[in-house]
Amino acid sequence: MNFAVIGAGAWGTAFTIHLSRLNHTVTLVPRRFEQALAIASTRENTDYLPGLPLPLSIQLGHELTPVLMEADVVILACPSQALRETCERVRAHLGLATQLKLIVSLAKGLELGTHLRPSEVIAAVLPDYAVGSLTGPTNAAEVARGKPAAMVLAATRTGAFLTEVQAALSGPTLRVYTTDDVAGVEFGGSLKNVYAIAAGCSDGLKLGDNTKAALLTRALAEMVRVGVALGAKAETFYGLGGFGDLVATCTGAWSRNRTFGQHLGEGAKASDLLAASKSVVEGYRTTESFAGLCKERGIDAPILGEIHRILYEGKPPAEALTALMTRELKRE
């Protein structure tokens, strides 16, 4: 199968390496020309995935028209806030893309202002194509190194082709499941970044394992409540796109969102951390989007609300914890 991966951050690069390992034809298209030149010359993404060389079978591209002409599947590996711009760029080069059957997003976040999920943004800009979301508990470097993992591919309007893509993505080191609950896996993948910031705050405050376990348990309950209120299926959040992604991102030392929260718990300011970060901390903007949605819909989300106060009102993490611990008592 022929894949085009647009976006050469850590995850886009890692997934390109995975596809190459499965002997697919794959072209990596960095969004910046200078990045494309750097990767082509060194065969390594030194900015986002250092130490992991790209196999020679991976093609590097920058001109979209010839890449899209050959692609069966386009994978958009860019941050959620850059997704619309990337889709508009793709749209301008789709005239000869006669083989394209599916566009898949790897983004985990909501578009600021519209509160749209990644697949909704893609569908708004590229309405003539089937759209899917690929998500789950995956660290980019581990996938690139071929360590075993599992993901879930959610899509509609694909028919039998979805199972073909599922088989093409799966291999000895990656098992891919499918679902039609696109909303569920996208809400799960987005919300877990918010709760990873909370988990990081707990780590930064050195509160221990009991606190982390309680936090993750209540975060999962809140994730289900928010997701179902927004139209997702409850059972989706107990799978790879919900609970699985939540556990990995809230406990992994590699997690940008958890690390961001840890520094907050240690006393750093969000603005300083964001200014110093080379990679996108998706949970920061996602918190703002979900806080707005929950307020509009009257959804009870106390953990999310306290993270919003930490990030946007400067509330000390220790005070946010006290607010959560002293809420009215209730049945589980």
Functional labels for PLM-detected ranges:
Residues 1-52, 59-62, 89:
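NAD(P)+-binding Rossmann beta1-loop-alpha1 motif at the extreme N-terminus of oxidoreductases
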Residues 9, 13, 33, 61, ...:
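Electropositive phosphate-/nucleotide-binding environments in soluble metabolic enzymes
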Residues 60-69, 73-148, 165-167:
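Rossmann-like NAD(P)(H) cofactor-binding subdomain of soluble oxidoreductases
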Residues 52-59, 99, 127-129, 172-174, ...:
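A short helix-to-beta-strand connector/capping loop
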Residues 192, 199-203, 228-238, 242-332:
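NAD(P)-dependent Rossmann-like dehydrogenase/reductase catalytic/cofactor-binding core
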Residues 82, 93, 121-131, 148-197, ...:
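Internal alpha-helical scaffold of NAD(P)-dependent oxidoreductase catalytic cores
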